[in-house]
Amino acid sequence: MITKAIYPGTFDPITNGHLDLVTRASAMFSHVILAIADSSSKKPMFTLDERVALAKKVTAPLKNVEVLGFSELMAEFAKKHNANILVRGLRSVSDFEYEWQLANMNRHLMPKLESVFLMPSEKWSFISSSLVKEVARHGGDITPFLPKPVTKALLAKLA
């Protein structure tokens, strides 16, 4: 049986924490779509096309992972791609409340859409794209937190 899961997010930029979760999800499901939200309201540093390109580059070794951009409701995107599982990462208890609300809204919009929550590996549990960008803006070392092509792209954006 093919199980298709979606791992949605803004991924601005994709971090080693995101890569850890998508790698683990790819071992659990037949097909994983890394769905990158347009999120223009968040004013991302990278364009949607740039985020998709970076994610494709760093997930290339994961043969069952597909990277797509989207701008519609997640439930609509899931229906369009015949997926009924959402993978979400939970770094802390504070993430849970927001994720719980999203999961319930998505289930309301698409009753067969299940949310699966994964804990990050301990070494990535404190990482977020926003935090990494802030460290980079102040000249801190971001190399431990991002795949090499992403580090290069982020430093180029800030130059």
Curated annotation (Swiss-Prot):
Query: Could you state one GO cellular component term attached to this entry?
Result: cytoplasm
Q: Which Gene3D superfamilies match?
A: HUPs (3.40.50.620)
- Site Transition state stabilizer: give positions: H18
Q: Name one Pfam family in it.
A: CTP_transf_like
Pathway recorded for this protein: Cofactor biosynthesis; coenzyme A biosynthesis; CoA from (R)-pantothenate: step 4/5
So what does this one do? Reversibly transfers an adenylyl group from ATP to 4'-phosphopantetheine, yielding dephospho-CoA (dPCoA) and pyrophosphate.
User: What is the protein name given in its UniProt record?
Assistant: Phosphopantetheine adenylyltransferase
| Organism in which the protein naturally occurs | Yersinia pseudotuberculosis serotype O:1b (strain IP 31758)
